[in-house]
Swiss-Prot record:
Xref: NCBIfam families: DAPAT_plant (TIGR03542)
Any GO MF annotation of the entry: pyridoxal phosphate binding
UniProt similarity note: Belongs to the class-I pyridoxal-phosphate-dependent aminotransferase family. LL-diaminopimelate aminotransferase subfamily.
InterPro entries with a match to the protein in the record: Aminotransferase_I/II_large (IPR004839), DapL/ALD1 (IPR019942), PyrdxlP-dep_Trfase (IPR015424), PyrdxlP-dep_Trfase_major (IPR015421), PyrdxlP-dep_Trfase_small (IPR015422)
Organism: Nostoc punctiforme (strain ATCC 29133 / PCC 73102)
Gene name of this polypeptide: dapL
Pathways involved: Amino-acid biosynthesis; L-lysine biosynthesis via DAP pathway; LL-2,6-diaminopimelate from (S)-tetrahydrodipicolinate (aminotransferase route): step 1/1
Stated name of the protein: LL-diaminopimelate aminotransferase
Gene3D superfamilies assigned to the protein according to its UniProt record, in alphabetical order: Aspartate Aminotransferase, domain 1 (3.90.1150.10), Type I PLP-dependent aspartate aminotransferase-like (Major domain) (3.40.640.10)
EC code(s) of this entry: 2.6.1.83
Length: 411
């Protein structure tokens, strides 16, 4: 009889967002007239930028002409896209990243999970708490953890609490860890990291031969010029960090699918015989074997992000969502709630009122004002008693949701 990967049985019954959908769908079925406003899953609502749409239409026409038709593309991504990314996203900020070190993919969610395939199972792994669930669940799936305790914490992971007491920036561990997940601007708390803070992590990683997985999916929302957009703006990061980025939240590619991972050629890991191995070569081998590349049409759309028109249009999109975040933050603060994030990030992190648990607040919001958010406990034990509200929605819906919430839950 065929056996299964028993690690999957360690996972919680439902991934956070499908569980939210299940509850919302059940409520909607029982209350068909309810006008539900969804501020939960971080999915964008505004259309693709015109520059991207125009480029993709042209790319479709290319595919209809024998002279410009494209078949299989390079697994790493077309050079014309990688070169623009290297120049505008990294080199323009003083980060010494070459186009050859960039890998185009169909999503940073996929990459943050797949990257584990090039690392051994004997690494000690650190995650923040609360944390984007994908980081934890993918480690469980590949066998890097033991079982979960009553709080949902898995044996074999080092949890680094991020709370209001430490400004939602995890303290560097006193013991040695091998792989470290950092996400800034942070999902779910909306916190940001200073250069000094990231430098401390880079120094720690260098001293301990550790690797940092740096998720910069929300870097476009940084408006403070003192906050770094990339970990490679920090001296020495090329030797210790892999960075993940996405076109989902800046250009609205959640349904179009395009992202990138940066693996510097100066980054190495240890083989079983103690020798140093270039991680770039391992990731390139993995991608060449298991991935056929992002479609030509989508990559042309992503390339248009770097045009003058594209840059102006994505800045407009980001500004729109940041204004939504500002409205959420200000309205909830005025209602007496404790509110964090939402300044250089599209997420607002709210302390639940009146001692309610995260899921109790979720159910109360859904049932009494028909607004959906994300329970903080779904991101980890330290998220209990908090709630994430997303700025990804129409202005009308955001304003209406705040009107409903503040009327019902004014402290």
């Amino acid at each position: 009889m065929a056996t299964i990967n028993n690690n999957y049985l360690k996972l919680k019954a439902g991934y956070l967002f499908p569980e939210i959908s299940r509850r919302v769908n059940a409520f909607a079925e029982a209350n068909p007239d309810a006008k539900i406003i969804r501020l939960g899953i971080g999915d964008v609502t505004e259309p693709l930028p015109e520059a991207c749409r125009t480029a993709m239409i042209k790319a479709v026409e290319d595919m209809g002409d024998r002279n410009t038709f494209k078949g299989y593309g390079p697994e790493q991504g077309y050079a014309w896209l990688r070169e623009k990314i290297a120049a505008q996203d990294f080199q323009a900020r003083g980060a010494n990243i070459d186009a050859s070190e960039i890998f185009i993919s169909d999503g940073s969610k996929c990459d943050t999970g797949n990257i584990l395939e090039i690392f051994g199972h004997d690494n000690l792994i650190a995650v923040t708490d609360p944390v984007y669930p994908v980081y934890v669940d993918t480690n469980v799936m590949v066998g890097n953890t033991g079982d979960a305790n009553d709080k949902g914490e898995f044996e074999g992971l080092v949890y680094l609490p991020i709370t209001a007491d430490n400004n939602f920036t995890a303290e560097i561990p006193s013991k040695k860890v091998d792989l470290i997940y950092l996400c800034f601007p942070n999902n779910p708390t909306g916190a940001t990291a200073t250069k000094e803070y990231l430098k401390a992590w880079v120094d720690y990683a260098k001293a301990n031969n550790s690797i940092i997985f740096f998720d910069a999916a929300y870097e476009a929302y940084i408006t403070d010029p003192s906050i770094p957009h990339s970990i490679y703006e920090i001296e020495g990061a090329r030797e210790v960090a892999i960075e993940f980025r996405s076109f989902s939240k800046n250009a609205g590619f959640t349904g179009t699918r395009c992202a990138l991972t940066v693996v510097p050629k100066t980054l190495t890991g240890k083989a079983a015989d103690g020798s140093d191995v270039e991680l770039w070569k391992l990731w390139n081998r993995r991608q060449s074997t298991k991935f056929n590349g992002v479609s030509y049409i989508v990559q042309r759309g992503a390339e248009a992000v770097y045009s003058e028109e594209g840059q102006a249009q994505i800045k407009g999109l980001v500004s729109f969502y940041l204004e939504n975040a500002k409205i959420i933050r200000e309205k909830l603060t005025a209602a007496g709630l404790s509110v964090y994030g939402g300044v250089n990030a599209p997420y607002v992190w709210v302390k639940t009122p009146n001692g309610l648990s995260s899921w109790e607040f979720f159910d109360k919001l859904l049932q009494t004002v028909n607004v959906v958010g994300t329970p903080g406990s779904g991101f980890g034990a330290a998220g209990e008693g908090y709630f994430r509200i997303s700025a990804f929605n129409s202005r009308e819906n955001v304003e209406e949701a705040m009107k409903r919430i503040t009327k019902k839950f004014k402290v």
